[in-house]
């Protein structure tokens, strides 16, 4: 008996079937790739949270020895590892930032109120000249009357009846806008906005005043 060479089980895909498969893959990629990019950006935000907690611990340790806080990173021993995507603002006091744009960093001749992001590692175009975060969405709470002035408040002369407020600014997604964080030695609350979430913020807890990952291009 003659057997047909055209066994239905051996037939290939038709052009329409291939086009459907390609379309499905394209749809899945359109959904998955942006989510993956956002996941990567959120993982970069962990640097800011980790280093701000280290800054908080450094201030508390310094206070336990000196009965005061400090406006300067080098005085409290706050020095994030190289390769930092975020810059850090300890205070708004006079002085130059530690600019990380070279392999070797000069020994500071005075107090260092801020530390830049590592533009030597990420390139000159990544440099953040001023790592001062937006602070409008963080509201101090309690009867002590603390505010959002970066540094020791009211002044160092008021210590030990003093407190501190600090922050960070970076670029988590390599786009034009910044990702901003703050940390305080006092209680506060976050206010809902285009780029921020509402909620109580405990002392020593980093708060994302402008979430660059969640709202590219939106005004704060």
Curated annotation (Swiss-Prot):
Keywords: Fimbrium, Membrane, Methylation, Transmembrane, Transmembrane helix
Localization, UniProt: Fimbrium; Membrane
GO CC list: membrane; pilus
Primary site of residence: other
Induction statement: By the two-component system PilR/PilS component PilR. In the contrary, PilS is a negative regulator of pilA expression. In addition, an increased level of c-di-GMP correlates with reduced transcription of the pilA gene. Expression of pilA seems to be negatively regulated by the accumulation of pilin at a cell end.
N-methylphenylalanine carried by residues: 13
Regulation: The two-component PilS2/PilR2 is required for proper assembly of T4P and regulation.
Presence of the UniProt keyword Membrane in the record: yes
Maturation propeptide residues: 1-12
Disruption phenotype: Deletion mutants show loss of observable pili.
Pfam families, sorted: N_methyl (PF07963), Pilin_PilA (PF14245)
Record function comment: Major component of the type IV pili that are required for social gliding motility through cycles of extension and retraction. Extended pili are composed of thousands of copies of PilA and retract upon binding to extracellular polysaccharides and thereby pull the cell forward.
Misc: Pilin assembly limits pilus production and S motility. This limitation could be linked to the high frequency of reversal of gliding direction observed in M.xanthus. Reversal implies loss of pili at the leading pole of the cell and commissioning of new pili assembly at the other pole.
Annotated family: Belongs to the N-Me-Phe pilin family.
Protein name: Type IV major pilin protein PilA
């Amino acid at each position: 008996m003659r057997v047909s060479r055209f066994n239905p089980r051996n037939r290939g895909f038709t052009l329409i079937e291939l086009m459907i498969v390609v379309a499905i893959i394209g749809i899945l990629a359109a959904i998955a790739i942006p989510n993956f990019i956002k996941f990567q950006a959120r993982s970069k935000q962990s640097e800011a949270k980790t280093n701000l907690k280290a800054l908080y611990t450094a201030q508390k340790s310094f206070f336990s020895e000196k009965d005061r806080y400090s406006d300067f990173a080098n005085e409290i021993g706050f020095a994030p590892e190289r390769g930092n995507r975020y810059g850090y603002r300890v205070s708004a006091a006079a002085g130059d930032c530690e600019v990380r744009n070279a392999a070797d960093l000069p020994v500071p001749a005075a107090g260092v109120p801020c530390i830049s992001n590592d533009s030597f590692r990420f390139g000159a175009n990544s440099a953040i000249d001023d790592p001062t975060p937006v602070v409008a969405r963080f509201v101090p709470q309690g009867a002590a009357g603390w505010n959002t002035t970066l540094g020791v408040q009211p002044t160092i002369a008021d210590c030990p009846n003093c407190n501190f407020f600090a922050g960070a600014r970076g670029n988590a997604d390599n786009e034009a806008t910044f990702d901003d964080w703050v940390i305080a030695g006092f209680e506060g609350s976050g206010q809902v906005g285009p780029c921020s979430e509402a909620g109580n913020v405990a002392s020593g807890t980093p708060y994302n005043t402008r979430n660059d990952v969640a709202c590219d291009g939106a005004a704060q």
